Amino acid sequence: MGLTLPALHTHTQIVGGGGRPFGGKKHSVEPVQKRSYEANFYPVFDDSSPPGADYFRELARVSKRRIIWGGNFFLEHLDTASCLIVWDKKRRGMDQADCEIAGTDLPGQSRIFDFRWNGMLQGDMKHKETRIHATQKPVALYAWIYQRWAKAGDKILDTHLGSGSSRIAAWDAGLDFWGCEIDKTYYDLEEERFAAHAAHQNLFLL
């Protein structure tokens, strides 16, 4: 796998697998907005090799609970999958998926989060998010997850940081957060996005 996380059962929850899709082909996706040369295109990446059993064993070693986006492809790697999280993107008749599914080992029943994510149309147009990543998820989705399943003192790890939406929501909720991103271009864009969000929020604290 090439990754060994240092802490043993210290991260309370993992919200992983959200930064990279796996479908057996290479992707090169045009972003919605062009802010700089680096953002003019998403780097081509090979998604033909989804995480194997070693990846999920490592997640289990360092976590107590796991939320894995795209988890409908990895249910055999979760101890229990009675609670699925479904993000309904409120779009129908498109050539893309109507929803995304996270496999979890959380207790309880499956839950649905409704939030439009259809081109330029988003569920919260007042706080519309600039798209910087091919599989970007809204901050509101992670905020809802943390509100429902996280508590003060929890530590969050995202092994596929991507656009950094999970990090922004964790920061807003006052949760400790660790993130990993394999692609430097995505990491730099995520850092820029997070810094802008934190600076904006800090204005209200002055």
Predicted regions mapped to residue ranges:
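Class I S-adenosyl-L-methionine
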Residues: 5-206
